[in-house]
């Protein structure tokens, strides 16, 4: 995996998934050069989708993309059997890979992680992208575990690394050849400079062209040009996490007239003071017309 993979929102309208809006957003991203899309992850509000909605969104994204870019579907769970069912369904409807978050809340040991990911890897054929995000799961996939999984299972090929500890990224890249994608927009360039391949991005939902240019420059070793774009987008990167993701990105998309719609409880609308900060940043970037 290499390039920019937006973690796409799930647009809602009147309490239901807005599939027309989903198609519009996907077409926009593809037209602006992304390498793939990642539905039903954290940004896609997967925790508040019903299992049937989760599966239908995956199916519809595969249909809308129609082979133009990769579809890497979020199929993780803190239940191995549920993650396995979602992953098998995603494979059956034609995804190019699955994204598996570290089990959250129940906090398995590193041995438990090996068995969790291993059981799923043995049951599907499509590539697996591990997703390490300790800030949400309260659990870190240790570098030794990542190395073991990459070497033991041929279809575990990449990791979305959202641990901000660059020492961990260095250990992983020094120990094995797994593809590392930044799971944090702000750390995209540092991770690529260490040998990473790209980013699973939130900001790319609204600035895909700029993000693709930045990552392309970085992967070509043109870091001076990449840094110019990084610092241009940096205020927006920071604001995407001024409140819990995906509250800021959905708010920004609504401001820009892009299909996004409401949030599902327990997530709720952004504070007015933060909306103003976001609006100012969008104005400064020339995104608001």
Curated annotation (Swiss-Prot):
Signal peptide coordinates: none
Domain of life according to the entry: Archaea
Class in the EC hierarchy, top level: lyase
Gene Ontology molecular function terms on file: 2-dehydro-3-deoxy-phosphogluconate aldolase activity; 4-hydroxy-tetrahydrodipicolinate synthase activity
Pathway named in the protein's UniProt entry: Amino-acid biosynthesis; L-lysine biosynthesis via DAP pathway; (S)-tetrahydrodipicolinate from L-aspartate: step 3/4
EC number: 4.3.3.7
Residues that hold pyruvate according to the record: 43, 200
Location within or outside the cell: Cytoplasm
Keyword Protein biosynthesis: no
InterPro entries (alphabetical): Aldolase_TIM, DapA, DapA-like, Schiff_base-form_aldolases_AS, Schiff_base-form_aldolases_CS
Chief location category: cytoplasm
Residues annotated as catalytic: 131, 160
GO annotation, biological process: diaminopimelate biosynthetic process; lysine biosynthetic process via diaminopimelate
Record's keyword terms, sorted: Amino-acid biosynthesis, Cytoplasm, Diaminopimelate biosynthesis, Lyase, Lysine biosynthesis, Schiff base
PROSITE patterns attached to this UniProt entry: DHDPS_1, DHDPS_2
Gene Ontology CC terms, in alphabetical order: cytoplasm
Cited function: Catalyzes the condensation of (S)-aspartate-beta-semialdehyde [(S)-ASA] and pyruvate to 4-hydroxy-tetrahydrodipicolinate (HTPA).
Protein name per Swiss-Prot or TrEMBL: 4-hydroxy-tetrahydrodipicolinate synthase
Species whose genome carries this gene: Methanococcus maripaludis (strain C6 / ATCC BAA-1332)
């Amino acid at each position: 995996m290499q390039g920019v993979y937006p973690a796409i929102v799930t647009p809602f309208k009147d309490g239901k998934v807005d599939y027309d809006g989903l198609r519009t957003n996907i077409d926009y991203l593809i037209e602006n050069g992304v390498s793939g899309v990642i539905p039903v992850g954290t940004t896609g509000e997967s925790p508040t989708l019903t299992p049937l909605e989760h599966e239908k969104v995956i199916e519809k994204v595969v249909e809308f993309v129609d082979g133009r870019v990769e579809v890497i579907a979020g199929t993780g769970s803190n239940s191995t059997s549920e993650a396995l069912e979602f992953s098998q369904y995603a494979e059956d409807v034609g995804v190019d890979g699955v994204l598996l978050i570290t089990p959250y809340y129940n906090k398995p040991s590193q041995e438990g992680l090996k068995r969790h990911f291993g059981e799923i890897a043995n049951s599907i054929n499509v590539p697996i992208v591990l997703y390490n995000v300790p800030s949400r799961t309260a659990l870190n996939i240790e570098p030794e575990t990542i190395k073991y999984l990459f070497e033991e299972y041929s279809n575990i090929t990449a990791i979305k690394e959202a641990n901000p500890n660059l020492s961990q990224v260095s250990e992983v890249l020094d120990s094995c050849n797994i593809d590392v994608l930044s799971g944090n927009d702000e750390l995209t360039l540092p991770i690529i400079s260490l040998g990473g391949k790209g980013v699973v991005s939130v900001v790319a939902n609204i600035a895909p062209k700029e993000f693709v240019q930045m990552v392309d420059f970085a992967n070509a070793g043109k870091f001076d040009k990449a840094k110019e774009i990084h610092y241009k987008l940096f205020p927006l990167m920071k604001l995407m996490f001024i409140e819990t993701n995906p509250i800021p990105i959905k708010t920004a998309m609504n401001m820009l007239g892009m299909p996004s719609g409401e949030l599902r409880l327990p997530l709720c609308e952004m504070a007015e003071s933060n909306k103003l900060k976001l609006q100012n940043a969008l104005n400064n970037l020339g995104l608001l017309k």
